[in-house]
Amino acid sequence: MQISDTGRSHTPDFHAVLAREDWQNQTITHLNRLPAHPVFASWRDELAARDNLPSSRRRQLDGEWQFSYARSPFAVDAQWLTQDLPDCRGTPVPSNWQMEGYDAPIYTNVRYPIDTTPPRVPEDNPTGCYSLHFTVEDTWRENGQTQIIFDGVNSAFHLWCNGVWVGYSQDSRLPAAFDLSPFLRPGDNRLCVMVMRWSAGSWLEDQDMWRMSGIFRSVWLLNKPQQRLCDVQLTPALDALYRDGTLQVQATIEATEAALAGLSVGVSLWRGEEQIAAGRQPLGTPTVDERGHYAERVDFSLAVATPAHWSAETPNCYRAVVTLWRGDELLEAEAWDIGFRRIEIADGLLRLNGKPLLIRGVNRHEHHHLRGQVVTEADMVQDILLMKQNNFNAVRCSHYPNAPRWYELCNRYGLYVVDEANIETHGMVPMNRLSDDPAWLPAFSARVTRMVQSNRNHPCIIIWSLGNESGGGGNHEALYHWLKRNDPSRPVQYEGGGADTTATDIICPMYARVERDQPIPAVPKWGIKKWISLPGEQRPLILCEYAHAMGNSLGNFADYWQAFREYPRLQGGFIWDWADQAIRKTFADGSVGWAYGGDFGDKPNDRQFCMNGLVFPDRTPHPSLVEAKHAQQYFQFTLLSTSPLRVRIISEYLFRPTDNEVLRWQVQAAGEPLYHGDLTLALPPEGSDEITLLDSLILPEGARAVWLTLEVTQPQATAWSEAEHRVAWQQFPLPAPLALPAPTVSAGAPDLIVSDEVWQIRAGSQCWTIDRRTGLLSRWSVGGQEQLLTPLRDQFIRAPLDNDIGVSEVERIDPNAWVERWRSAGLYDLEAHCVQCDAQRLANETLVDCRWHYLRGEEVVIVSHWRMHFTADGTLRLAVDGERAETLPPLPRVGLHFQVADQQAPVSWLGLGPHENYPDRRSSACFARWEQPLAAMTTPYIFPTENGLRCDTQALDWGRWHISGHFHFSVQPWSTRQLMETDHWHKMQAEDGVWITLDGLHMGVGGDDSWTPSVLPQWLLSQTRWHYEVSLRCL
């Protein structure tokens, strides 16, 4: 018989409760809290449980509560237990009080926001006092047990009901249930919840996130009968052939010993309204130990012939209804969605239902830009749909168990989940100080064991995690073995202590590179290809964090996926992370924008390091999300031949055929369609096909830039996407016959007008002016109307990316960061000196030849040579040669920029698009003729940086401007200088015109991590000489 620790021979008064300072003691994880269990609803009707109808015995207490704020628990007046304090006002529950105008949110990554010695926390400990008046039905008071369940309270709380102390709980991220029955009275009842911002538990909650407080998840009342189900463990399993299934059931009853007699437990398994299997058994188990034969428990199994399997691709859920009976009288019914699947590690591979998985994963914090850490079901569904639409199949609950509803949705929509214990001690020195201290084992244990007891019935959870960044120690070792004994159906992972310790079934490093080793002394990170080949190592490798998506990032991402597909034991990973953790704020100047660390006066803080998302805080996608979608897509393509035009397509679906997929293809030349077609795909799981698209590929004379584009779409809507959703795409360049450019008829050379100050070149309505002193093309008029707002100038810098900055900041300079290397090299302060500016009128063109020396002090570090060829048709063909000193670090870019008047026209280009792309992040971009409004050419990263580039462009058309050549470009209403000098995007100011930037070369963005230089050598501008050409016309 399971009995909670609710003995109340002595009920302490208010001051006695506070005097104990339970929140200062890591060994007191709770007082009077009920044992952890799955989500209950206590239906009294089996079919209502089957259909998941609202239960009359489960009631939500969300809504407006009364709230008072105090600087510490000891500053709270005891009269609050019986009446609201004078300063109270209404506040929503759930909420974080920092989002309601009290106290300040704090963002730190590693550093603890409190400066005391564990387990102690500051005496000045912000405290929220919540109160609520409620009533309960007389039947609830008179029969059975009435529980109150808090799904999440940060970080610890005491509970009173009608002025009587009920209990205490720590652990912000797991439900805490208490028995209210002894305290309820007829009519009005008063709940009082005292929440402390800091507790001993805070030392185990040092996650990289905003530190907020309050009742931030739902609160429930639950009425259970006198004899009741108090725990149910459901384990669906498949046989060795993955054909037939069994549902193993263990149910525990809470009742007096006398009442146990005559009770039985039934189980029925449903798919929709069809009952698949059913059974019933009296209490008692064959298990015998020193306690006896477990009279309050029942263990049995149901055989299920050929059940539909659960996977992320095919989330086939059954409804398991567990009932408690006295004879033929139904006392209670509970129900859960379950799935038949078998997760195992065999032959060095993580397998689901016998198939090796490829984890297309992402880390996700519970965060909302308006509500802080309060997420609604609609928010959860929005995230799940976006993940599924972008080819994610897995999510890591970083770094704590999520709200209960999250798992139910993942079961239904189909996402693999790593459920992670709410343990992180990243700021400890050493990091394993607490994880190797036996005095902290009870606190560690409560977080791991209660997570499992609460969530183990969910099929979506395929891996348990012991926590995050807490070093390696005996506490983790002990809990690893507890998990393996108590849930052998799932593997366990833990990265701390080196990612490959004896406390993990999976090598699960964070930010290990594909090839390069990082020989960190304590915990070396080997290149992932090398790691799986180390002597004696047979485990699969799944990166628990990789591809740090901070701002303009995710370079090199396709390299990881090439390795995952090449090496079977490299089974994917979880991108860091899903959404930018910024908060909407009205700033002191009245402006409204997204805030990050330090914007609330929070100290310490880690600035914008909270913004590492694939999506903005409001879930608008970053361009990097498209790159992730493409790399992770479930179809791979190979060009077999060009005439006939044949391709091979491979499906990476493990469990479903292509029953809703169409292959669409098109051949384009210079963005113009030549051929196209579509066909329905009929591939089995893991199937492939070779398809002839054209018997003969015949190209028109002069065809250039010929590409084959393949894409797979879903014509029918699915549970997570609309009709015609694109799931995969790929492009292949096709050979085109060489052709000489069409000869041009010379119209003579433009006129050259010479003065002491300028060269002036005229051709019809075109007039160009070059300043002879500076060498700059300073004016370009068409029909007497000036087009330039600034001269054309060399551009060697970019507004530093987060990856360029790394961890460098004013208080702590990192000389290895790219921005510091460029700064120390003087790149941001170079002085241009024109050392040559010659002009001559030739037979067919007028040539202006200019050379600049870029000086750092007295030293010439860059030489730039421009040859400006002006022709009678109004074209400027610009050939640029340059050279840099070997003492300079690789440059971020080599190009030119200039400002022009806004054209009030869309931007059209022939090149890679449509989204922003960079040299090391362009696998997802397609070569075509694209057109977008000017506003879409900017990516408004919250911390302003270089953005908006489009690579491998052959033609750019915007209003009057027509540019051709081979270049990368951006067109934006913001200067590089303003991007560099502005710290929040909402502070960006409109400028007079629009900046056109044309790059011959541009460095990659990197992204393996954001604190070390992560741009791979092939994407660095290591050359010391360069050449590029572009042609410009303004009509």
From Swiss-Prot:
Residues reported to bind Mg(2+) 1: 424, 426, 469
Top-level class of the enzyme under EC nomenclature: hydrolase
Gene3D superfamilies for this protein: 2.70.98.10, Galactose-binding domain-like, Glycosidases, Immunoglobulins
Residues noted as binding Mg(2+) 2 in the record, renumbered to the chain: 605
Entry GO terms, CC: beta-galactosidase complex
List of residues binding substrate: 109, 208, 469, 545-548, 612, 1011
One GO BP: lactose catabolic process
GO molecular function, one term: carbohydrate binding
Reactions that this protein is recorded to catalyse: Hydrolysis of terminal non-reducing beta-D-galactose residues in beta-D-galactosides
Enzyme active site: 469 (proton donor), 545 (nucleophile)
Cofactor: Mg(2+); Na(+)
Assembly notes: Homotetramer.
Protein name (Swiss-Prot/TrEMBL): Beta-galactosidase 1
Lineage: Bacteria, Pseudomonadati, Pseudomonadota, Gammaproteobacteria, Enterobacterales
Gene: lacZ1
